[in-house]
Design a protein with these regions (language model features):
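Fe(II)/2-oxoglutarate oxygenase catalytic core
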Residues: 1-204, 208-239
Length: 239
């Protein structure tokens, strides 16, 4: 697959909430996004381990190489590395530790409790998550949250125990959580930022930011990559 950045690529550098965690919003990412959709349509998907509410398949190496090479400076800035200078800090190399085509296929009423609240992907501050939307219908984007009781917008190792202790104390249950995907303010969480899903838009944020997909109660799962809620989800590490 021959991929390149779109000539009209646009990068917005935003900050989330009171804690000002970084967020990149990148529109018109690749020049040939439709080829990614067709590639996904010819790929075998499977249910992964963990709590992802759908099915996944490996994204092509050419995609990973393009993103790491052409967006390196923006990614390093999102990691808090000034001007791309990594000498004395790390090797300066970026790598995808995970990069998958992803399709949300779990109906709202079938979600487990952890899938109905915002989550973090890791406790590491210096690790990124990316989501590249590859659907053209109005199927929702991604939102970021503050836990009301603790005030936490990000969860690191020092916050992990008090955060989950607080959740246990709040006695999470069906009535507390609501019947489906979180999609706005609740008694437990305040939505502090939201980005709509748009074809060929990518979000990049730190993996310890509390976040969730914006998926409505009327969401109808579709396992077809050409018509379903297809994205490329990745974890990017500085090594």
């Amino acid at each position: 697959m021959n991929l390149d950045l779109h000539r009209n690529i646009r990068i917005q550098k935003l900050a989330i909430g009171v804690e000002r965690a970084p967020l990149l919003v990148i529109d018109d990412v690749v020049a040939n996004a439709d080829e990614l959709v067709e590639d996904a349509a010819s790929t075998v998907f499977a249910e992964p381990a963990g709590f992802y509410p759908g099915i996944r398949a490996w994204a092509p190496p050419a995609y990973q190489q393009l993103i790491l090479a052409k967006l390196r400076d923006a990614l390093l800035e999102c990691l808090g590395v000034p001007n791309g200078i990594t000498s004395g800090i790390t090797s300066g190399l970026l790598r995808f530790s995970m990069c998958h085509y992803s399709l949300v296929t779990t109906p709202p009423e079938k979600l487990a409790a952890p899938q109905r609240i915002p989550h973090v992907d890791s406790l590491a501050k210096n690790a990124l998550a990316s989501i590249h939307y590859l659907f053209k219908a109005s199927l929702g984007g991604t939102a970021f949250y503050r836990h009301r009781k603790t005030g936490f917008e990000t969860i690191d190792e020092s916050r992990n125990e008090p955060y989950f202790r607080s959740l246990r104390d709040e006695n999470l249950g069906p009535a507390t959580l609501g019947p489906g995907y979180i999609n706005g303010d609740t008694d437990l969480f305040e939505q502090i930022a939201k980005q709509d899903g748009a074809f060929n838009r990518m979000l990049v944020y730190r993996r310890n930011s509390l976040h969730s997909g914006c998926i409505g109660s009327d969401f109808v799962p579709d396992p077809n990559p050409r018509t379903g809620r297809l994205s490329i989800n990745g974890f990017i590490d500085l090594v």
